[in-house]
Swiss-Prot record:
Keywords: Early protein, Host-virus interaction, Inhibition of host apoptosis by viral BCL2-like protein, Modulation of host cell apoptosis by virus. It comes from the Viruses. It comes from Canine adenovirus serotype 2 (strain Toronto A 26-61). PROSITE patterns: BCL2_FAMILY. This is E1B protein, small T-antigen. The keyword Disulfide bond does not apply. GO terms for biological process: symbiont-mediated suppression of host apoptosis. Belongs to the adenoviridae E1B 19 kDa protein family. It holds the Pfam family Adeno_E1B_19K. InterPro entries: Adenovir_t-Ag_E1B_19kDa, Bcl2-like.
Length: 169
């Protein structure tokens, strides 16, 4: 299961996050993507760690209460490192944790909260995915160029008779 691949579509990503905020049971398991149940279970198991990262008295919760979401989420989301599946799942779980614990007295309507969190988080995942793909493509092309350069050198040496190999000297 590759979370980056599964979350390529925004609507699928949104459904995963929405499903992961629900309590465990039949509805979450059968009405949402399978990854929603996995992420929801991670949130429930690691909630204590998430509270250590972002305690209840942290200024972040006050900003959410007052509706200042852009700067808050930008700072948290851009710091995410998504280089392996474990970190990707932890990122999804943390996003779900934020939604689950959004202050109930916030000026942000409940209907808008999901998209306020999902849009920047999904963008971050897409940027990470594209960057990883570009790096892999670049590494592959460098390896191919090195291989073809070595082959050309060998061919030139053979044609010129300058080879160190006693069979071709």
């Amino acid at each position: 299961m590759d979370p980056l691949k599964i979350c390529e579509n925004y609507l699928t990503f949104r459904a995963i996050i929405r499903g992961s905020t629900l309590s465990p049971g039949f509805f979450r398991r059968w009405c949402f993507p399978a990854l929603a149940d996995v992420v929801g279970n991670i949130v429930e198991q690691e909630e204590g760690r998430f509270w250590q990262i972002l305690p209840e008295n942290h200024a972040f919760w006050g900003l959410l209460r007052r509706g200042f979401t852009v700067a808050s989420f930008t700072e948290i989301i851009t710091a995410a490192q998504l280089e392996n599946r474990g970190r990707q799942l932890a990122f999804l779980a943390f996003i779900s944790f934020l939604l689950r614990n959004w202050p109930s007295d916030s000026v942000v309507p409940e209907a808008d909260r999901l998209d306020l969190v999902c849009a920047p988080a999904w963008s971050r995942m897409q940027i990470w995915s594209q960057t990883a793909r570009l790096i892999n493509d670049l590494q592959d092309s460098v390896l191919e160029e090195q291989g073809s350069a070595e082959e050309e050198e060998c061919e030139e040496a053979l044609l010129a008779g300058d080879s160190d190999d006693p069979l071709f000297g």
